[in-house]
């Protein structure tokens, strides 16, 4: 703020830009700064130490502006530069709003002739009235009144003894003393209500937390004292996990050949024993983990898909069918004991049987005639066999 104004004054006056030098004192955790500014060959120092370097430079620039504005030759230029932006009016309005007061009221009075008018302005803030210097325009008169009010408020705030406090905050603290009693009473009651409501909400939260802690501790103690291992198994999450599947048997042929001779009854007994052992292991792990998780009421939970799992029901064992390779049947071996005569007799039998079948199938024969023919054929066949046997011997 003050540094910008001093720089603008130097540019309009065709002077060199102001240069700042700083002195640091105190420890690293609480340093203090004091600055000095060189403006057109003149050096102006900050009156007190400041907590930051920026505050010290602004304090030095403020001292230089106050000194330059008090001099007659450059008073008009300095006042013009200081009031062109209307910074003091803005500062006065912001500070009054921060202090919770009404905005400042400006009253201007015109004097002089019509060709050369003059204006004097007074500003009213917090029950106090401040009068500024007269000016040729109404706007400039209001700015002068704001400058007078700000300078008097700074003197009241005694900034020299409170170097670490910002200027605007100090002025706001001074203005807050001039609040009406009703406003201050209203603010205190509002603050008290806020504090009490916050304390009540904090108490409610604390009571709710304590109630939940007591409830959980009571559940833990009751479950640990009265629950059995089966109840732990029901309330534990691990009990809901199905047992691991039995190891898959190899489908290689030699491995199957080892167990091919076993009966189905033995296989059933072995699978039953494996299921019992796996179930016992799962029960042991579930009871061990349920002691670590006493608050887990896992009867409510379901697996993904919405299907609940019963820890007692086990899936039936899957029996793999043994793969037996199928080979083609070997061709029949020729009988070396066969003679040509036997072959001829077999051929004769075949032909005779065919002839007999054809004779029996002839139309016009009755049932009795067919029976007689079959008996004669059987006799002829038996006689031919006897003749063949005698011939062979």
From Swiss-Prot:
Gene Ontology MF annotations: double-stranded RNA binding
Ranges where the DRBM domain occurs: 1-70, 87-155
Highest rank taxon of the organism: Eukaryota
Region (Disordered): 220-251, 335-371
Tissue expression pattern: Expressed in the shoot apical meristem (SAM).
Assigned keywords, A-Z: Repeat, RNA-binding
Coiled-coil regions listed: none
Pfam families from the UniProt entry: dsrm
Gene3D superfamilies with a match to the protein in the record: 3.30.160.20
InterPro entries for the chain: AtDRB-like_DSRM_1, AtDRB-like_DSRM_2, dsRBD_dom
Observed effect of gene inactivation: No visible phenotype.
Xref: SMART domains: DSRM (SM00358)
Biased composition (Polar residues): 347-361
Known partners and oligomeric status: Heterodimer with DRB1, DRB2 or DRB4. Interacts with DCL1 and DCL3.
Purpose: Binds double-stranded RNA. May be involved in RNA-mediated silencing.
Protein name: Double-stranded RNA-binding protein 5
């Amino acid at each position: 703020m003050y540094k910008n104004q001093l720089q603008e004054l130097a540019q309009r006056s065709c002077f060199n830009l102001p240069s700042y030098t700083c002195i640091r004192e105190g420890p690293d955790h609480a340093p203090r700064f004091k600055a000095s500014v060189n403006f057109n060959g003149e050096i102006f120092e900050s009156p007190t130490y400041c907590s930051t370097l920026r505050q010290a430079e602004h304090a030095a620039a403020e001292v230089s502006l106050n000194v330059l504005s008090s001099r007659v030759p450059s008073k008009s230029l300095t006042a013009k530069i200081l009031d062109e932006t209307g910074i003091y009016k803005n500062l006065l309005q912001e500070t009054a709003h921060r202090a919770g007061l009404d905005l400042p009221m400006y009253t201007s009075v015109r004097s002089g002739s019509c060709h050369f008018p003059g204006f004097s302005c007074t500003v009213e803030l917090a029950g106090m009235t401040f009068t500024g210097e007269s000016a040729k325009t109404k706007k400039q008169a209001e700015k002068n009144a704001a400058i007078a009010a700000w300078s008097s408020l700074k003197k009241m705030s005694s900034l020299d003894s409170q170097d670490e406090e910002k200027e605007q905050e100090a002025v706001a603290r001074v203005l807050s003393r001039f609040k009406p009693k009703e406003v201050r009473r209203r603010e205190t009651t509002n603050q008290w209500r806020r504090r009490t409501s916050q304390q009540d909400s904090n108490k409610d939260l604390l009571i709710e937390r304590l109630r939940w802690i007591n409830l959980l501790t009571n559940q833990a103690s009751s479950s640990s004292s009265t629950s059995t291992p089966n109840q732990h198994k029901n309330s534990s999450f691990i009990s809901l996990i199905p047992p691991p599947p039995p190891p898959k048997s190899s489908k290689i042929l030699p491995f199957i050949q080892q167990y091919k001779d076993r009966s189905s009854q033995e296989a059933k007994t072995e699978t039953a024993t494996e299921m019992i052992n796996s179930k016992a292991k799962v029960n042991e792990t579930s009871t061990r983990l349920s002691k670590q998780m006493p608050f887990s009421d896992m009867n409510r939970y379901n697996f993904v898909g919405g299907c609940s799992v019963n820890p007692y029901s086990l899936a039936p064992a899957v029996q793999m069918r043994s793969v037996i390779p199928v080979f083609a049947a070997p061709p029949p071996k020729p009988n070396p004991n066969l003679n040509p005569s036997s072959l001829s007799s077999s051929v004769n039998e075949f032909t005779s049987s065919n002839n007999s079948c054809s004779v029996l199938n002839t139309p016009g024969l009755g049932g009795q005639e067919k029976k007689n023919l079959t008996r004669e054929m059987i006799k002829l066949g038996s006689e031919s066999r006897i003749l063949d046997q005698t011939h062979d011997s």
